[in-house]
Structures are given as C-alpha cells and as structure tokens.
C-alpha cells in the first residue's frame, strides 16, 4: 500500500538521492546540488511538494509543483523503479490533476517529466 503526503525536511536526503543525477553526472556532486535544490523547494512552495511512501515508509516517488498565476510549472516528477511503482505514478497523477482542474494558464513541464506523466 502506497501513501502520498506533503514532503517534510526529513525527506530531503531520500529525495536528493533519488534525483542526484538530474543535477550532475557525478553522483556526489549531484546529490549535494539536489539536496540544496530540494530544501529551496520546501522553503518556496512547501504546500506543493509531495512524496509517495511504500508500506516500509521508504520514499518511492516525489513531485514538486510551482502553481503560479501566469505559469503552472511541474518542477520535478520522479518515480523510483517505475515498473514496480506504477501505483505511485497513479497517486502523483491524481494529485496533479486536482491542481489542473481550474488552471487557465500555461503549464510548463520538462520533457522527462512529461514522458512519465503520459506513460
């Protein structure tokens, strides 16, 4: 059973490990950058940062949104071992769709995230 919830500061390490290679090809450098980037998200849009946990309380997915007045940005969308965690993908999609129901602005999404959303 998976559960979606708002990200907390104590989740930053796990999320940074998951997204490190998005920040740099060197894993250690990427981790440091991802950690700072994730902390920044929690400061800027704390109510729009989500994680999905498995039954062992391990984070298997993360999504960060920037719902702005003129541009709605899907900043990060990551699912670990997506073939085994399709339910996590479904939970994130459902959360995202709730946001998009009333959005009448441009939606920005990186191609990598978009590919995951439609798969």
Where are these regions (language model features)?
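Short amphipathic alpha-helix that is part of the acyltransferase structural core
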Residues: 1-33
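Alpha-helical elements of Rossmann-like donor-binding domains used by nucleotide-donor carbohydrate transfer enzymes
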Residues: 14-18, 37, 91, 95
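Active-site rim helix/loop that mediates acceptor-substrate recognition in acyltransferases
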Residues: 28-49
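Conserved beta-strand in the GNAT
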Residues: 51, 57-66, 73
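Conserved acetyl-CoA binding element of GNAT-fold acetyltransferases
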Residues: 70-82
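Conserved acetyl-CoA-binding loop-helix of GNAT-fold acetyltransferases
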Residues: 84-99
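Conserved GNAT acetyl-CoA-binding A-motif
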Residues: 100-112
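Conserved active-site alpha-helix within GNAT-family acetyltransferase domains
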Residues: 111-119
